[in-house]
Amino acid sequence: MREETREQPAPLRSGLTTGSCATATSLAAAKLLLTGQRNDAVDITLPKGKVVQMRLEFCRLIGECAEAGTLKDAGDDPDVTHGALVYSQVRLLVEPGIGFVAGSGVGTVTRPGLVLAVGEPAINPVPRRMISEHLQHLADACGYLGGFEVTVNVQGGEQLALKTMNPRLGILGGLSILGTSGIVRPFSCAAYIASIHQGIDVAHTNGYTHIAACTGNASEDTMRRVYGLPEIALIEMGDFVGAVLKHLRKVPVPRLTLCGGFGKISKLAAGHMDLHSRHSSIDLPQLAGWAADIGADEALQAAISGANTSQQALALAHAAGIALGDAVCAHALAFARSVVPAQVHVEVFAIDRQGGIVGQAGVQ
């Protein structure tokens, strides 16, 4: 008899950030230099006080330096760095303090607007603090009065970074060493939302007064074609339109264009901030009501309400000469304007699957 399977899936497993990996490997390398102790695993304390043990792939001396490495375990999160080797090299310095260097596969900041200055290695503030605190605690325990130079590396990081927002943000040469809690929460989307905020910050700091937030590649291509916007002004928001609109309260870029597929824009028009199907759905009767507002007869309203998809509803309206695309964009525009500051000019485009514009509102 075949073994029964559980009706409920097992809980998703959390992982550890690249910042935690860099902390563990830096600590292990420094400990080898100061004590001669070669570890197979090290304990680190995360920002909220939790202690975790991280297994090391190696811990060895290389000339006057030491290096240690660990495999990034992102748990059940679809993280681009899952399984990557993160390793740190540590060198002792005469003067106290801790310096950071971008090693192989770790990027360097080349544009203003991020939390790190131009020219700095892309090792974010919390990982820097974690590494510094662990090394200082070790130094105090060993009576060591000098400093440390920490070089963080990610094997294959330069290629992995091409799958992230780093090139668009002006972080070149590799990945960022990230983490605020030290823990990767599966499907938390926190890193993606942070990259949206960073993209807006970088565009604003570099003097761009017009940005286009797009749901995907087709909408980005449309914005390039319509406005000729450079990469730095194109914000890949995916389903997180709320992350864009709310951030403009802090960073009021003068002109915002929102562009997405007709179905996604229909959800925005209904007041949804998260456009993913897990969190919002297309309300076909509402589309029928909006069509009625601009002249659709009862038969067309019924057909739209009973349509299989939003695209079919749009096609039915188009065949009857009803500009449903423009009406939906107008409702989306009204909702977006209710969220952002009054001084931000907003416009909305809806596109079909081929990237053709099927509706617009607020366009200058």
UniProtKB/Swiss-Prot annotation:
Q: Give the enzyme's EC designation.
A: 2.1.1.195
UniProt GO molecular function: cobalt-precorrin-5B C1-methyltransferase activity
Gene3D superfamilies hit by this protein: CbiD-like (3.30.2110.10)
What are its GO biological-process terms?
anaerobic cobalamin biosynthetic process; methylation
Q: Which SUPFAM superfamilies match?
A: CbiD-like
Catalytic reaction(s) noted: Co-precorrin-5B + S-adenosyl-L-methionine = Co-precorrin-6A + S-adenosyl-L-homocysteine
| UniProtKB keywords | Cobalamin biosynthesis, Methyltransferase, S-adenosyl-L-methionine, Transferase
The answer to keyword Transferase applying to this record is yes
Pfam families in alphabetical order: CbiD
Q: What pathway, per the record?
A: Cofactor biosynthesis; adenosylcobalamin biosynthesis; cob(II)yrinate a,c-diamide from sirohydrochlorin (anaerobic route): step 6/10
InterPro entries given in the database record: CbiD, CbiD_sf
Report which superkingdom the organism of origin falls in: Bacteria
Q: Which family does it belong to?
A: Belongs to the CbiD family.
Which PANTHER family did the record assign?
COBALT-PRECORRIN-5B C(1)-METHYLTRANSFERASE
Write the protein's name: Cobalt-precorrin-5B C(1)-methyltransferase
Question: Which species?
Answer: Pseudomonas putida (strain ATCC 47054 / DSM 6125 / CFBP 8728 / NCIMB 11950 / KT2440)
